[in-house]
Amino acid sequence: MLNEFKSKLENGEFVYGVFVKTSDPMFNEIIGISGYDYVILDTEHGPTDIENQQNNIRACELRGILPIVRVPYIDDNVIGKALDIGAMGIQISQIRCAEDVKKVIKYAKFYPEGERGVCRFVRAADYSSLNRNAFFKKENEKIIIIQLEGKEAIDNLDEILEVDG
């Protein structure tokens, strides 16, 4: 799923997705059946908890749709948990400066690209059946979407765009 999504973007193709604010996995199955490429599971404004998100991610995988979790704020635990439960990417809103972007990357990626906390007994590591190097490589390739908001972000756009990752 992730490679196909990235390939489409690299080839200049459009990808189509839907924001979901419900906790019912059925909606994600229907979206997948309908032919969309991805779904953004909104934990910033939606009523779901981490367990609901994990079930929503399973529904996305079942129907071949890329699950991206929109996390509510920049925090190492929030970002790590979203990725640990199997999200193939994260979206972060309220980005205002390059330092915000650097924090997101640091929290989302494992060493040497970041400082994400390690636990291999999670869904994303196939409950430790993936070896450590394969797990780190897979996780460091996941999608990070930043959402710039406010005048400060626009004023800092050039420095934000210079951040690698």
Question: What do these predicted ranges mean?
Answer:
Residues 20-34, 73-81, 151-163:
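Short, acidic/polar
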Residues 1-19, 129-140:
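N-terminal amphipathic alpha-helix/helix-capping segment at the start of soluble metabolic enzymes
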Residues 43-46, 72-73, 95-97:
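Short, ordered loop/turn segments at secondary-structure junctions
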Residues 50-84, 108-114, 136-140:
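Alpha-helix-loop-beta-strand connector modules within alpha/beta enzyme cores
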Residues 27-54:
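Glycine-rich, proline-tolerant flexible connector loops at the mouths of alpha/beta enzymes
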Residues 77, 89-164:
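Conserved anion-binding
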Residues 14-20, 39-41, 67-71, 90-92, ...:
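Hydrophobic faces of well-ordered beta-strands that scaffold small-molecule active sites
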